[in-house]
Amino acid sequence: MQPLTAETTARHSRHFQLIVDVHLLLVRNGDLLLGRRANTGYGDGAYEPPSGRLAERETLVEAAVRVAAAQVGIALDPARVTLAHVLHDVSGAGRMAFFLTEDLDLLTTGGWAAGAAGPTGSYSDFGWYPLTDLPANMIDRARVAVRNYAAGARFSTYPAFGM
């Protein structure tokens, strides 16, 4: 073990900070709800599962419920929200993404229709896409996570090995 010096102490005292993204994996009959990004300045026109950033002192479940209401316009039951996948972005972007899901029998009877954008305007429209046939124009790290989730993996890294 190397002795502690002023240089190593200073280097290790700077804490790494992550941006935490919360995505919704809303799956119905093998189809995933994806939104087309709009008015965000990043990836506009590309598809991804509805998402938002984790707020200070907010739990992942609270964030998922908030994102569902704000982005999609639906109410999720916090007791039914579960963790489906985690993606660690090691590209240098400093991001960790948690993908949460809920049983979607409520969506089929709740009067919500794909295509309706939520109140925040981060998405221009929504649609249901087969997990086995995702749109070509999709945010890369979201595609990696969704493919791994569909294959049964609970964790992935981005960029994925071989990308």
List PLM regions with ranges.
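Residue-level preference for beta-strand/loop junctions
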Residues: 16-18, 43, 93-95
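Acidic, metal-coordinating catalytic segment for phosphate/diphosphate chemistry
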Residues: 1-23, 158-159
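Conserved hydrophobic "DFG−1" position in protein kinase catalytic cores
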Residues: 26, 34, 100-101, 128
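A short coil-to-beta-strand element that immediately follows conserved catalytic motifs
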Residues: 75-85
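Nudix hydrolase/Nudix homology domain
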Residues: 42-44, 118-163
